[in-house]
Amino acid sequence: MKIFICEDDPKQRENMVTIIKNYIMIEEKPMEIALATDNPYEVLEQAKNMNDIGCYFLDIQLSTDINGIKLGSEIRKHDPVGNIIFVTSHSELTYLTFVYKVAAMDFIFKDDPAELRTRIIDCLETAHTRLQLLSKDNSVETIELKRGSNSVYVQYDDIMFFESSTKSHRLIAHLDNRQIEFYGNLKELSQLDDRFFRCHNSFVVNRHNIESIDSKERIVYFKNKEHCYASVRNVKKK
C-alpha cells in the first residue's frame, strides 16, 4: 500500500513521516511512503495514476489555493475506495467533508503528539485490514471497534482478550502489540464465535491466543505475555 502525506508544516510533516516509517519497519507491513509534500497537486497527480488503493494523510489548511478537503474530494474521483485521513488543528472545519462528500476514515488533531501517533497507527492498521478484505483472501475475520467518530478494524487473530474499562460503556481490546479503547459490551463479544469466551465478569478471552492457564491462581496467560484473571467456575471450562 502506498502512503501519501500532504502537510505544509515541515516539522509536522517530518514527524508524520517518522511515525509511519517506524511503524512500517517494526510491524513489517507491506506499505511505503510514496510521497510526503506540501504540494497538493503532486498528491493529486499521483492519485490519478494509482492502480492500487492508497492511504492519504491530508492537512486541511494548506498554504495553497486548494484546501485538504477539496484535495480529498478530487482524490476520490481517481481512488474511490482509498483511505483518506484528515490532519488538522481546526475541528470546526470538519463539517466541510460533508459539503464535499468526502468519506473520511478519520480526523486527527495535531495538538496532542501522543494522540497523533496513536491515531495514525490505528488508521494504518485499519487501512491494511481493509486492503486484505478487498483482496482475494476473504477468509480473514475482522471486528469493527467503534471509538466514537471513527472505527478501527482488527483481525480476530490479533486479539488476546477484551477487558472492561473504568469508563462507562467502554472496553479495552488487548491486541498482540497494543491496546484500543472502544465502545461495546462483553456479552456481545463473547458471542462472536467459539474462540471467544467470557472467563470473568470483566474479561472475554480469545482461546486461540492462550499460552497457559494457572488454575490455582486463576490466571490466564497469553502469547503476547499479557495476562488476565478467570473466575473459579470458569477456569475448567476453558
From Swiss-Prot:
Keywords: Activator, Cytoplasm, DNA-binding, Phosphoprotein, Transcription, Transcription regulation, Two-component regulatory system
Subcellular location: Cytoplasm
Gene3D superfamilies reported in the protein's UniProt record: 3.40.50.2300, LytTr DNA-binding domain (2.40.50.1020)
Domain HTH LytTR-type, first and last residues per copy: 143-238
Ranges for domain Response regulatory: 2-125
Modification sites for 4-aspartylphosphate: D59
TM spans (from-to): none
Pfam family of the protein (one): LytTR
Superkingdom of the source species: Bacteria
Entry GO terms, CC: cytoplasm
MF term (GO), any: phosphorelay response regulator activity
Presence of the UniProt keyword Transcription in the record: yes
Job description of the protein: Required for high-level post-exponential phase expression of a series of secreted proteins.
The protein's name: Accessory gene regulator A
Originating organism: Staphylococcus aureus (strain Mu50 / ATCC 700699)
Gene expressing this chain: agrA
